[in-house]
Protein backbone atom coordinates (compact mmCIF):
# COMPACT_ATOMS: atom_id res chain seq x y z
CA UNK A 1 0.00 0.00 0.00
CA UNK A 2 2.73 2.51 1.01
CA UNK A 3 6.41 2.18 0.16
CA UNK A 4 9.25 4.55 1.01
CA UNK A 5 12.57 3.76 -0.64
CA UNK A 6 15.67 5.51 0.75
CA UNK A 7 13.77 8.76 1.23
CA UNK A 8 15.72 11.86 2.28
CA UNK A 9 14.40 15.39 2.75
CA UNK A 10 16.88 18.24 3.19
CA UNK A 11 15.85 21.84 3.86
CA UNK A 12 18.14 24.74 3.08
CA UNK A 13 18.52 27.27 5.88
CA UNK A 14 20.47 30.50 6.27
CA UNK A 15 23.14 28.78 8.34
CA UNK A 16 23.33 25.60 6.26
CA UNK A 17 21.17 22.59 5.48
CA UNK A 18 18.88 20.60 7.78
CA UNK A 19 18.18 16.92 7.13
CA UNK A 20 14.63 16.35 8.37
CA UNK A 21 14.25 12.82 6.96
CA UNK A 22 17.39 10.76 6.50
CA UNK A 23 17.43 7.72 4.18
CA UNK A 24 14.13 6.24 5.38
CA UNK A 25 12.84 2.97 3.90
CA UNK A 26 9.46 1.68 5.03
CA UNK A 27 6.69 -0.71 3.97
CA UNK A 28 3.13 -0.18 5.23
CA UNK A 29 0.65 -2.94 4.46
CA UNK A 30 -2.85 -2.47 3.13
CA UNK A 31 -5.49 -2.38 5.87
CA UNK A 32 -3.14 -2.07 8.85
CA UNK A 33 -2.83 0.64 11.48
CA UNK A 34 0.80 1.71 11.40
CA UNK A 35 2.27 4.00 14.05
CA UNK A 36 5.28 6.28 13.72
CA UNK A 37 6.54 7.52 17.09
CA UNK A 38 9.27 9.95 18.01
CA UNK A 39 9.99 13.05 20.05
CA UNK A 40 9.65 16.59 18.67
CA UNK A 41 12.10 17.20 15.85
CA UNK A 42 12.41 13.53 14.94
CA UNK A 43 11.07 14.14 11.41
CA UNK A 44 7.59 12.64 11.84
CA UNK A 45 5.58 15.56 10.46
CA UNK A 46 7.92 15.97 7.50
CA UNK A 47 7.50 12.28 6.75
CA UNK A 48 3.71 12.56 6.71
CA UNK A 49 3.93 15.58 4.38
CA UNK A 50 5.98 13.45 2.02
CA UNK A 51 3.26 10.79 2.07
CA UNK A 52 0.50 13.18 0.96
CA UNK A 53 2.61 15.03 -1.59
CA UNK A 54 2.78 18.35 0.28
CA UNK A 55 6.56 17.96 0.18
CA UNK A 56 8.79 16.35 -2.43
CA UNK A 57 11.77 14.32 -1.19
CA UNK A 58 15.28 15.47 -1.97
CA UNK A 59 15.99 11.88 -2.99
CA UNK A 60 14.22 8.52 -2.91
CA UNK A 61 10.71 7.33 -3.85
CA UNK A 62 7.36 7.58 -2.08
CA UNK A 63 4.66 5.25 -3.46
CA UNK A 64 1.11 5.48 -2.05
CA UNK A 65 -1.69 3.24 -3.35
CA UNK A 66 0.28 2.49 -6.49
CA UNK A 67 1.17 6.11 -7.28
CA UNK A 68 4.72 7.46 -7.17
CA UNK A 69 4.15 10.69 -5.21
CA UNK A 70 7.58 11.96 -6.29
CA UNK A 71 6.50 12.03 -9.95
CA UNK A 72 2.78 12.89 -10.09
CA UNK A 73 1.81 16.46 -10.97
CA UNK A 74 -1.22 18.59 -11.69
CA UNK A 75 -4.51 16.75 -12.09
CA UNK A 76 -2.96 13.38 -11.23
CA UNK A 77 -1.56 14.82 -7.99
CA UNK A 78 -5.00 16.21 -7.05
CA UNK A 79 -6.51 12.79 -7.76
CA UNK A 80 -3.83 11.14 -5.60
CA UNK A 81 -4.55 13.51 -2.71
CA UNK A 82 -8.27 12.72 -2.87
CA UNK A 83 -7.32 9.12 -2.06
CA UNK A 84 -5.33 10.24 1.00
CA UNK A 85 -7.37 11.61 3.92
CA UNK A 86 -5.71 13.53 6.75
CA UNK A 87 -6.63 14.61 10.27
CA UNK A 88 -4.71 17.13 12.35
CA UNK A 89 -3.84 17.90 15.95
CA UNK A 90 -5.78 21.20 15.97
CA UNK A 91 -8.73 20.05 13.80
CA UNK A 92 -8.39 22.77 11.07
CA UNK A 93 -12.16 23.23 10.77
CA UNK A 94 -13.88 26.11 8.98
CA UNK A 95 -15.38 28.06 11.88
CA UNK A 96 -18.05 29.80 9.78
CA UNK A 97 -19.44 26.45 8.57
CA UNK A 98 -21.60 23.93 10.40
CA UNK A 99 -20.62 20.32 11.01
CA UNK A 100 -22.52 19.29 7.88
CA UNK A 101 -20.92 22.03 5.78
CA UNK A 102 -17.40 21.21 7.02
CA UNK A 103 -17.82 17.56 6.06
CA UNK A 104 -19.30 18.50 2.68
CA UNK A 105 -16.47 20.92 1.83
CA UNK A 106 -14.07 18.42 0.16
CA UNK A 107 -17.01 16.97 -1.78
CA UNK A 108 -17.87 20.44 -3.08
CA UNK A 109 -14.29 20.93 -4.23
CA UNK A 110 -14.38 17.53 -5.95
CA UNK A 111 -17.54 18.56 -7.83
CA UNK A 112 -19.81 15.90 -6.33
CA UNK A 113 -23.52 16.57 -7.16
CA UNK A 114 -25.56 18.00 -4.27
CA UNK A 115 -27.87 15.00 -3.80
CA UNK A 116 -24.97 12.55 -3.72
CA UNK A 117 -23.04 14.94 -1.48
CA UNK A 118 -25.85 15.15 1.08
CA UNK A 119 -26.21 11.37 1.16
CA UNK A 120 -22.49 10.92 1.77
CA UNK A 121 -22.46 13.54 4.53
CA UNK A 122 -25.37 11.80 6.30
CA UNK A 123 -23.46 8.49 6.17
CA UNK A 124 -20.34 10.08 7.63
CA UNK A 125 -22.21 11.90 10.42
CA UNK A 126 -23.65 8.58 11.54
CA UNK A 127 -20.29 6.80 11.16
CA UNK A 128 -18.45 9.18 13.48
CA UNK A 129 -21.28 9.47 16.02
CA UNK A 130 -22.36 13.07 15.45
CA UNK A 131 -26.06 12.53 14.76
CA UNK A 132 -27.99 15.47 16.19
CA UNK A 133 -24.99 17.82 15.98
CA UNK A 134 -24.90 18.30 12.20
CA UNK A 135 -26.11 21.93 12.35
CA UNK A 136 -23.75 22.98 15.16
CA UNK A 137 -20.76 25.24 14.55
CA UNK A 138 -17.22 24.29 15.66
CA UNK A 139 -17.38 26.80 18.53
CA UNK A 140 -20.31 24.80 19.95
CA UNK A 141 -18.44 21.48 19.94
CA UNK A 142 -16.12 19.77 22.42
CA UNK A 143 -12.58 18.86 21.39
CA UNK A 144 -13.56 15.26 20.76
CA UNK A 145 -16.54 16.30 18.63
CA UNK A 146 -14.32 18.63 16.58
CA UNK A 147 -11.94 15.78 15.87
CA UNK A 148 -14.86 13.58 14.83
CA UNK A 149 -15.78 16.25 12.29
CA UNK A 150 -12.16 16.23 11.11
CA UNK A 151 -12.27 12.44 10.70
CA UNK A 152 -15.56 12.57 8.78
CA UNK A 153 -14.20 15.29 6.49
CA UNK A 154 -11.04 13.24 5.86
CA UNK A 155 -13.19 10.26 4.84
CA UNK A 156 -15.51 12.23 2.55
CA UNK A 157 -13.86 11.22 -0.74
CA UNK A 158 -13.53 7.53 0.22
CA UNK A 159 -9.74 7.61 0.63
CA UNK A 160 -7.59 4.50 0.60
CA UNK A 161 -5.25 5.90 3.26
CA UNK A 162 -5.90 7.99 6.38
CA UNK A 163 -2.98 10.00 7.78
CA UNK A 164 -3.24 11.12 11.42
CA UNK A 165 -0.79 13.82 12.54
CA UNK A 166 -0.81 13.92 16.38
CA UNK A 167 -4.60 13.56 16.13
CA UNK A 168 -5.16 13.06 19.88
CA UNK A 169 -2.45 15.30 21.37
CA UNK A 170 -4.87 18.15 22.12
CA UNK A 171 -7.45 15.89 23.79
CA UNK A 172 -7.94 14.68 27.38
CA UNK A 173 -7.25 10.98 28.11
CA UNK A 174 -10.89 9.86 28.05
CA UNK A 175 -11.60 11.65 24.76
CA UNK A 176 -8.33 10.32 23.33
CA UNK A 177 -9.46 6.75 23.99
CA UNK A 178 -12.85 7.44 22.38
CA UNK A 179 -11.21 8.81 19.22
CA UNK A 180 -8.78 5.88 19.08
CA UNK A 181 -11.71 3.45 19.41
CA UNK A 182 -13.41 5.26 16.52
CA UNK A 183 -10.29 4.90 14.35
CA UNK A 184 -10.14 1.16 15.09
CA UNK A 185 -13.83 0.84 14.18
CA UNK A 186 -13.29 2.72 10.90
CA UNK A 187 -10.27 0.55 10.11
CA UNK A 188 -12.34 -2.61 10.59
CA UNK A 189 -15.45 -1.39 8.77
CA UNK A 190 -13.75 0.18 5.77
CA UNK A 191 -10.50 -1.80 5.59
CA UNK A 192 -8.75 1.57 5.60
CA UNK A 193 -4.97 1.82 5.90
CA UNK A 194 -4.17 4.22 8.77
CA UNK A 195 -0.79 5.86 9.36
CA UNK A 196 -0.59 7.49 12.76
CA UNK A 197 2.07 10.00 13.85
CA UNK A 198 2.45 10.45 17.61
CA UNK A 199 4.83 11.00 20.51
CA UNK A 200 2.60 9.01 22.90
CA UNK A 201 3.31 5.31 23.44
CA UNK A 202 -0.21 4.90 24.84
CA UNK A 203 -1.61 5.61 21.36
CA UNK A 204 0.71 3.02 19.78
CA UNK A 205 -0.16 0.44 22.44
CA UNK A 206 -3.90 0.88 22.08
CA UNK A 207 -4.51 0.66 18.33
CA UNK A 208 -1.42 0.01 16.19
CA UNK A 209 -0.50 -3.27 14.50
CA UNK A 210 3.09 -2.23 13.81
CA UNK A 211 5.29 0.68 14.81
CA UNK A 212 8.37 2.52 13.57
CA UNK A 213 10.49 4.60 15.94
CA UNK A 214 12.04 7.80 14.55
CA UNK A 215 15.02 9.69 15.89
CA UNK A 216 16.97 12.48 14.18
CA UNK A 217 15.22 11.83 10.88
CA UNK A 218 15.92 8.10 10.81
CA UNK A 219 13.85 4.98 11.46
CA UNK A 220 15.90 3.39 14.23
CA UNK A 221 13.57 0.47 15.02
CA UNK A 222 10.37 -1.06 13.65
CA UNK A 223 8.24 -4.15 14.04
CA UNK A 224 5.00 -5.53 15.44
CA UNK A 225 3.90 -3.62 18.54
CA UNK A 226 4.03 -6.60 20.92
CA UNK A 227 7.49 -7.55 19.68
CA UNK A 228 8.80 -4.02 20.18
CA UNK A 229 7.27 -3.89 23.69
CA UNK A 230 8.78 -7.26 24.58
CA UNK A 231 12.23 -6.65 23.17
CA UNK A 232 13.05 -2.95 22.53
CA UNK A 233 16.52 -2.61 21.03
CA UNK A 234 17.34 1.09 20.82
CA UNK A 235 17.72 3.42 23.84
CA UNK A 236 14.93 5.71 22.59
CA UNK A 237 12.56 2.76 22.19
CA UNK A 238 13.40 1.55 25.68
CA UNK A 239 12.56 5.03 27.03
CA UNK A 240 9.18 5.05 25.29
CA UNK A 241 8.30 1.57 26.57
CA UNK A 242 9.54 2.33 30.07
CA UNK A 243 7.42 5.50 30.29
CA UNK A 244 4.32 3.42 29.66
CA UNK A 245 4.96 0.36 31.81
CA UNK A 246 7.26 1.73 34.49
CA UNK A 247 6.66 5.41 35.30
CA UNK A 248 9.14 7.24 37.55
CA UNK A 249 6.94 6.83 40.64
CA UNK A 250 6.98 3.03 40.15
CA UNK A 251 10.77 2.99 39.92
CA UNK A 252 11.08 5.10 43.08
CA UNK A 253 8.56 2.95 44.98
CA UNK A 254 10.42 -0.26 44.10
CA UNK A 255 13.84 1.18 45.00
CA UNK A 256 12.49 2.19 48.43
CA UNK A 257 11.64 -1.47 49.08
CA UNK A 258 15.24 -2.67 48.75
CA UNK A 259 15.95 -2.11 52.43
CA UNK A 260 12.87 -4.08 53.47
CA UNK A 261 14.14 -7.25 51.79
CA UNK A 262 17.65 -8.03 53.12
CA UNK A 263 17.60 -11.47 51.46
CA UNK A 264 16.47 -12.95 48.15
CA UNK A 265 16.03 -10.80 45.07
CA UNK A 266 13.61 -8.40 43.43
CA UNK A 267 12.84 -9.03 39.76
CA UNK A 268 10.78 -7.43 37.03
CA UNK A 269 8.77 -9.96 35.01
CA UNK A 270 7.48 -8.91 31.59
CA UNK A 271 4.56 -10.84 30.07
CA UNK A 272 3.53 -10.57 26.42
CA UNK A 273 0.56 -12.15 24.65
CA UNK A 274 -0.57 -15.57 25.90
CA UNK A 275 1.99 -15.55 28.73
CA UNK A 276 0.01 -12.77 30.46
CA UNK A 277 -2.89 -15.15 31.08
CA UNK A 278 -0.94 -18.01 32.67
CA UNK A 279 -1.02 -18.69 36.47
CA UNK A 280 2.76 -18.30 36.60
CA UNK A 281 3.21 -17.32 40.25
CA UNK A 282 1.03 -20.21 41.41
CA UNK A 283 3.16 -22.67 39.43
CA UNK A 284 6.41 -21.22 40.78
CA UNK A 285 5.24 -21.58 44.39
CA UNK A 286 4.05 -25.15 43.73
CA UNK A 287 7.19 -26.36 41.99
CA UNK A 288 10.01 -24.61 43.86
CA UNK A 289 10.93 -24.03 47.49
CA UNK A 290 10.72 -20.25 47.21
CA UNK A 291 8.52 -17.59 48.73
CA UNK A 292 7.08 -15.12 46.21
CA UNK A 293 5.78 -11.71 47.21
CA UNK A 294 4.10 -9.54 44.56
CA UNK A 295 5.23 -5.94 45.03
CA UNK A 296 3.50 -4.23 42.14
CA UNK A 297 1.98 -5.10 38.79
CA UNK A 298 0.15 -3.85 35.73
CA UNK A 299 -1.40 -5.48 32.66
CA UNK A 300 -2.32 -3.45 29.58
CA UNK A 301 -4.10 -4.44 26.39
CA UNK A 302 -2.46 -3.68 23.05
CA UNK A 303 -4.17 -3.97 19.68
CA UNK A 304 -2.47 -7.38 19.34
CA UNK A 305 -2.91 -8.77 22.85
CA UNK A 306 -1.99 -8.35 26.51
CA UNK A 307 1.24 -6.88 27.86
CA UNK A 308 2.05 -6.98 31.55
CA UNK A 309 4.78 -6.13 34.05
CA UNK A 310 5.07 -7.63 37.53
CA UNK A 311 7.58 -6.74 40.25
CA UNK A 312 8.18 -9.65 42.64
CA UNK A 313 10.42 -10.57 45.56
CA UNK A 314 11.71 -14.16 45.59
CA UNK A 315 13.29 -15.61 48.73
CA UNK A 316 14.79 -19.02 49.44
CA UNK A 317 17.94 -21.00 48.77
CA UNK A 318 20.10 -19.61 45.95
CA UNK A 319 19.78 -22.70 43.75
CA UNK A 320 15.99 -22.80 44.19
CA UNK A 321 15.67 -19.14 43.18
CA UNK A 322 17.88 -19.75 40.13
CA UNK A 323 15.74 -22.74 39.13
CA UNK A 324 12.58 -20.68 39.58
CA UNK A 325 13.96 -17.87 37.39
CA UNK A 326 14.98 -20.37 34.72
CA UNK A 327 11.46 -21.83 34.76
CA UNK A 328 9.91 -18.36 34.45
CA UNK A 329 12.05 -17.55 31.41
CA UNK A 330 11.10 -20.86 29.77
CA UNK A 331 7.46 -19.72 29.99
CA UNK A 332 8.31 -16.89 27.54
CA UNK A 333 8.43 -14.32 30.33
CA UNK A 334 11.31 -11.84 30.35
CA UNK A 335 13.17 -11.55 33.66
CA UNK A 336 15.23 -8.57 34.82
CA UNK A 337 16.83 -8.73 38.28
CA UNK A 338 16.38 -5.31 39.89
CA UNK A 339 18.03 -6.03 43.25
CA UNK A 340 19.93 -9.14 44.38
CA UNK A 341 20.55 -9.42 48.15
CA UNK A 342 21.54 -13.11 48.22
From Swiss-Prot:
Transmembrane segments: none annotated. GO terms for molecular function: ABC-type D-methionine transporter activity; ATP binding; ATP hydrolysis activity. SMART domains: AAA, NIL. Residues 2-241 form the ABC transporter domain. The keyword Nucleotide-binding applies. Its main location: membrane. Its EC number is 7.4.2.11. It catalyses: L-methionine(out) + ATP + H2O = L-methionine(in) + ADP + phosphate + H(+); D-methionine(out) + ATP + H2O = D-methionine(in) + ADP + phosphate + H(+). It is found in: Cell membrane. ATP binds at residues 38-45. It is a peripheral membrane protein. The keyword Metal-binding does not apply. GO terms for cellular component: plasma membrane. InterPro entries: AAA+_ATPase (IPR003593), ABC_transporter-like_ATP-bd (IPR003439), ABC_transporter-like_CS (IPR017871), ACT-like_dom_sf (IPR045865), MetN_ABC (IPR041701), MetN_ABC_transporter-like (IPR050086), NIL_domain (IPR018449), P-loop_NTPase (IPR027417). Keywords: Amino-acid transport, ATP-binding, Cell membrane, Membrane, Nucleotide-binding, Translocase, Transport. Signal peptide: none annotated. Part of the ABC transporter complex MetNIQ involved in methionine import. Responsible for energy coupling to the transport system. The complex is composed of two ATP-binding proteins (MetN), two transmembrane proteins (MetI) and a solute-binding protein (MetQ). PANTHER family: AMINO ACID IMPORT ATP-BINDING PROTEIN (PTHR43166), METHIONINE IMPORT ATP-BINDING PROTEIN METN 2 (PTHR43166:SF36). Belongs to the ABC transporter superfamily. Methionine importer (TC 3.A.1.24) family. This is Methionine import ATP-binding protein MetN. It comes from Geobacillus kaustophilus (strain HTA426). The gene is metN.
Amino acid sequence: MITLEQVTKIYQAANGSVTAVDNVSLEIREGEIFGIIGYSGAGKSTLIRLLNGLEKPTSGRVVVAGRDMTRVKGRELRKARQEIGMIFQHFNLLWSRTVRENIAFPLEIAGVPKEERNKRVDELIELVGLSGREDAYPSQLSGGQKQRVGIARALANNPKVLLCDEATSALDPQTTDAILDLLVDINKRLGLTIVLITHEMHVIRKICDRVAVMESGRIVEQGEVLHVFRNPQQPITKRFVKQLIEPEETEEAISHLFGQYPSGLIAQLTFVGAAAGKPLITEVVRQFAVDVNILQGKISQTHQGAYGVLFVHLDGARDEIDRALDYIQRQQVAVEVIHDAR
